[in-house]
Amino acid sequence: MMATERANRMKLDRVSEKRALVNNAILGLYDYGGTAVFNAVTEYNTETGGNYTPVTVMAPSVFREFMIWLASKIDYLRELMQDNGKMFHQDVTGKEVDRHTPMSRQKLFLHSAFEKYFRANCSNLFNPSYLPEFAAVESVAYWQNPQAPMDVQGTAKTIDSAGAVQTVTTALCEDVIGILFDDDFMGLSNISNWSAPEPYNARFGYQNTWYHSTYRSITDWSENSLLIRLA
């Protein structure tokens, strides 16, 4: 029982570190704006001449067509990310650099509700079995808070145009569908795990054991990444 509880707590620590890394990326991309963010409803309105909102686009009369369009658009954005270009990353110190990300190096973290919407409404377009070159589609039940599963709130560490680290404060990034990125864009490594027991407490008959983990993370803003929102 205690060993299981300890393992669960250590796993939760790792999950928390990963979630914090992804949320930092979401808030950073939201702050950069421009081509770092794809606002799906806005783009849908532009292409169709509609006047939908994140609420009205989910109405039964529109929902299926919008999901089919969105699945196709994400597929198109993945193709764009394969080509050398400057659209999906940040350039620093005044030097523009072309980047490309092959399908096999792309990852998509997708809100699980939308993964299920895609499968229900357009499985012939959005089906991992038809995407053998696509490295990973990972379903995420919530980004930060299960009570507001599509929202992220807080601060983020990014880089400015000179390449220096900066802290950005974003009150709230709402309606996050997913994040598409090069697998070099962000990563997390556990560089040290160790444990040691305290001396045995002879009076009360117990012994504490302390567990330590050290994580290091990286977010390379010069690599390709894209925030996808229902906005």
Where are these regions (language model features)?
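Solvent-exposed, non-transmembrane amphipathic alpha-helical segments
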Residues: 15-18, 22-26, 30, 83-90, ...
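Long, charge-rich alpha-helical interaction segments
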Residues: 43-114, 118-122
